[in-house]
Amino acid sequence: LPPVGSGLAPGAGIGGRLRDTVMRAFTARSVREGMRQRSGVRAEIGLPVQDPGPLRRLIATLPALEVPRPDWPAEAVVVGPLHFEPTSAVLAIPAGEGPVIVVAPSTATTGTAGLAEVALELEPGVTLPAGSRVVISRIAGDALAVPPWATVGLGRQDELLRHADLVVCGGGHGMLSKTLLAGVPMVVVPGGGDQWELANRVVRQGSGRLVRPLTVEALSVEVGEVLSSPRYREAAMRAAASIAEVADPVRVCHEALRPGR
């Protein structure tokens, strides 16, 4: 499951560590309540009340998106993102030489509404760098008036990311991790759920900027900032390189099931 959190950085100093200790205590109480409820359901369906727990816990993310976890169990293993492309279609990019901005509105019900519409209000040479091209990757949505410098539709995001100079997205883990694996910087417009937590991790890692609330002016400023400075792409490239630190999920599962383990 993606991380649902406060968006806070790990605490520093005595006050920060105290804050984290208190928050962990509250979280532990919720976990204990969940375990109690699960034991009750297991008994109702004829399973042993005591859950033996998993052999391994696969953490499917980039190390660069993670935070220190002193309480992780020994069976937790970071295996890298596990992506799925829902289509084989390739979305055409408008012709030109300017930067390619891929916009991927959130598919979650808690995502920020209107991202595609606001993105299309930006104009190359006015609120975007001259020659900019906008590609809005979405599964469905209301009909939009699409200017000649933009494209809207369903297409493979991994293919779009090969050409992208910047990604604007809602902050869901799937698009964030795809974007960072491609070494592309981003502007994140988070909604609720895990998006606020992940957006703040991206900002702290250095590969993107955060917009909240969403307005044309705010989006224009942050897009311009990321495109004008190489430090965001450099941070995104560092995040992509962190994939070298993960374990092979197939090997992890095979080793866990090996006789005698």
Language-model regions: role of each:
Residues 51, 218-261:
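C-terminal amphipathic helix plus adjacent low-complexity
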Residues 1, 82-84, 156, 191-194, ...:
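Short, acidic/turn-prone active-site loops that include or flank metal/cofactor-
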Residues 153-201:
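A donor-sugar binding/catalytic signature common to diverse glycosyltransferases
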Residues 1-100, 105-114, 128-131, 144:
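Nucleotide-sugar-dependent glycosyltransferase catalytic domains
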